[in-house]
Amino acid sequence: MYYPFVRKALFQLDPERAHEFTFQQLRRITGTPLEALVRQKVPTKPVTCMGLTFKNPLGLAAGLDKDGECIDALDAMGFGSLEIGTVTPRPQPGNDKPRLFRLVDAEGLINRMGFNNLGVDNLVENVKKAHFDGILGINIGKNKDTPVENGKDDYLICMEKVYAYAGYIAINISSPNTLGLRTLQYGDALDDLLTAIKNKQNDLQAIHHKYVPVAVKIAPDLCEEELIQVADSLLRHNIDGVIATNTTLDRSLVQGMKNCQQTGGLSGRPLQLKSTEIIRRLSQELKGQLPIIGVGGIDSVIAAREKIAAGATLVQIYSGFIFKGPPLIKEIVTHI
């Protein structure tokens, strides 16, 4: 397969430049016959989750296509679902560069992107142009300059704008790169947010005559007590699913490696065991009442199977896709 050669060339570039170059090429082919260049035939293995039927259990995690620019090209690669975003009500540049770093030996990435995106209105226009007929998740967050205490307003604005176009909506309260965001995972702040989101979901269902499930994306750095509280809140508020997990602040498995001290969230293989353990504990707490979408360090069929064995119904990849390319999609979907 050609990807090892592509990767070698891309890895000569700064990580964000490599990302921009790749998306420049994908934008050129998305929605055109040139999509055949990236198309892969993968088996159909339907999975039902959150009341939706997914073509196969492997999805693209949020963060790669933040603005929904390359939906059709990514679909052609064989994903069972795509999660675009994180998107915010207003456009924002994100944190200062450099803000994306490779840990090549560990097959990990550290990012402190900070929800750089062109805003929810732009994303909706891109979704309208796409021909994608699969399950599209839209991951939403708050603007950096919105005070945390007003954060729920940003989520409600985004929900209203994406509801008609989303297969499901993902609530990102677990990125470590927006100051104070993770505090929304705890106690009264979480309850207030989930109450507002559930009320908005019910209102939008009445307006649009369709029910769009909501999943909450959580961090891997929750302690036991916090995890129990989160599980309890999700169940009490009848949230439809949970995405476990986002990136970690833990550097214990990458000590001494180049870039290991960079600020930001660590993803890829060093996150694999930590995220799987969170899924296992979450599954025990949820007792099958709420589906889990497993994400974090999946870079092989075995890693995907481990997430499912721990309690995930669906799995997603991001960093593994950067390091292994489209062949990883076919490999996982075929053998999972």
UniProtKB/Swiss-Prot annotation:
Question: Where does it localize?
Answer: Cell membrane
Q: Where does FMN bind?
A: A62, G63, L64, D65, K66, T86, N139, N172, K217, T245, G268, G297, Y318, S319
* Superkingdom classification of source: Bacteria
**GO molecular-function term, one example from the UniProt record:** dihydroorotate dehydrogenase (quinone) activity
Record family assignment = Belongs to the dihydroorotate dehydrogenase family. Type 2 subfamily.
Q: In which pathway does it act?
A: Pyrimidine metabolism; UMP biosynthesis via de novo pathway; orotate from (S)-dihydroorotate (quinone route): step 1/1
What is its membrane topology? Peripheral membrane protein
- Tell me a GO cellular component: plasma membrane
The UniProt entry, under NCBIfam families, shows: PRK05286.1-1, PRK05286.1-2, PRK05286.1-4, PRK05286.2-5, pyrD_sub2
Identification of the protein by name: Dihydroorotate dehydrogenase (quinone)
Its Enzyme Commission number(s) read: 1.3.5.2
BP terms from Gene Ontology: 'de novo' pyrimidine nucleobase biosynthetic process; 'de novo' UMP biosynthetic process
Q: Where does substrate bind?
A: K66, N111, R112, M113, G114, F115, N172, N177, N246, T247
Co-factor requirement: FMN
Instruction: Tell me which Pfam families the record gives.
Output: DHO_dh
**Which HAMAP family does its entry note?**
DHO_dh_type2 (MF_00225)
Q: What does this protein do?
A: Catalyzes the conversion of dihydroorotate to orotate with quinone as electron acceptor.
Catalysed transformations (reactions): (S)-dihydroorotate + a quinone = orotate + a quinol
Q: How is the cofactor bound?
A: Binds 1 FMN per subunit.
Query: Does the keyword Hydrolase belong to this entry?
Result: no
What UniProt keywords are attached to this protein's entry?
A: Cell membrane, Flavoprotein, FMN, Membrane, Oxidoreductase, Pyrimidine biosynthesis
Q: Which organism is it from?
A: Salmonella choleraesuis (strain SC-B67)
Q: Which residues form the active site?
A: S175 (nucleophile)
